[in-house]
């Protein structure tokens, strides 16, 4: 784990409470960001592309099949973090959007579309994402972009690797023979992007417990790589920074004989602290990755916030 154990919510039967009430968010006034717009300074594209080349070299040597490489954009932030969350939520609605803050004034603003784990009693599913295309305003061009993404052999192969990893991770805690790929990959459209997503389902024994479930599956396959341990080592060597909350997970857990919980993958997640906003973005790197194209994909993923 990348965190210290700490109580985030107080849970009693079906009631829950936190320091941030949903009613508070709903009542926030719509923020006008134009006067406070700050340019996010990205790392130089050349440095990121050099990292892509290093990963391709490791792939050529047989050490890796795939790895997720990220970089971080940052800028000064003036305003109210909750208001920014509400403003972005209206333009980027996703089921797993969330706002979190601690007593020290640090905030997470997440508009992640990716489900890491969804648990309902003995049923578990995971919905990894790999493959991205920009949405077009013209309906015909937009449909063409989605079709091209769906037929892109590189993106298909990349998602297939992540599906296999996720299936293997869930197999560590699932009942024998109870892991299945429900959807090997379909294009799902969001307000600004198309993504390719898969669905893997498993049955498990709930008495196994949350700690063992997380230990078997974390970090998510889609933001690490294959094989996972070597990919994480390579990522740390190349990125030379802590990812913090980015690519971690945020969710809730209702313990019982038939537990329920849901955890997102913290992508599309901005971190705000001490007047600075940080947004990390990444792309999956495989042998046939083009460094320039991967760099441009990361910028595309951060566009929803940079254009705000």
What residue spans do the PLM features occupy?
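Extended alpha-helical targeting/anchoring segments
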Residues: 12, 18, 23-308
């Amino acid at each position: 784990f990348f965190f210290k154990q700490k109580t985030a919510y107080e849970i009693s039967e079906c009631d829950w409470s936190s320091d941030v009430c949903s009613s508070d968010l709903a009542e926030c006034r719509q923020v006008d960001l134009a006067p406070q717009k700050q340019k996010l300074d990205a790392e130089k594209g050349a440095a990121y592309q050099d990292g892509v080349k290093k990963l391709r070299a490791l792939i050529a040597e047989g050490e890796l099949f795939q790895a997720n490489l990220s970089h971080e954009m940052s800028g000064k932030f003036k305003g109210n973090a909750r208001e920014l969350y509400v403003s972005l939520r209206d333009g980027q609605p996703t089921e797993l959007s969330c706002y979190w803050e601690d007593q020290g004034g640090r905030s997470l603003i997440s508009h992640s579309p990716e489900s890491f784990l969804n648990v309902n009693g003995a049923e578990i599913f995971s919905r990894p994402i790999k493959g991205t295309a920009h949405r077009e305003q013209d309906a015909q061009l937009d449909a063409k972009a989605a079709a091209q993404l769906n037929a892109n052999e590189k993106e298909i192969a990349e998602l297939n690797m992540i599906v296999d990893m996720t299936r293997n991770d869930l197999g560590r805690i699932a009942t024998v023979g109870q892991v299945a790929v429900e959807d090997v990959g379909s294009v799902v459209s969001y307000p600004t992007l198309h993504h390719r997503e898969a669905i893997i389902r498993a049955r498990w024994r709930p008495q196994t417990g949350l700690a063992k479930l997380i230990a078997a599956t974390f970090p998510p396959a889609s933001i690490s790589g294959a094989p996972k341990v070597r990919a994480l080592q390579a990522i740390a060597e190349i990125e030379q920074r802590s990812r913090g909350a980015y690519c971690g997970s945020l969710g809730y857990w209702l313990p019982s004989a038939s537990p329920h919980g849901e955890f997102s993958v913290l992508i599309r997640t901005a971190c705000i602290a001490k007047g600075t906003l940080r947004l990390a973005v990444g792309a999956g790197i495989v042998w046939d990755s083009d460094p320039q194209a991967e760099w441009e994909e990361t910028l595309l993923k951060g566009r929803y916030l940079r254009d705000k």
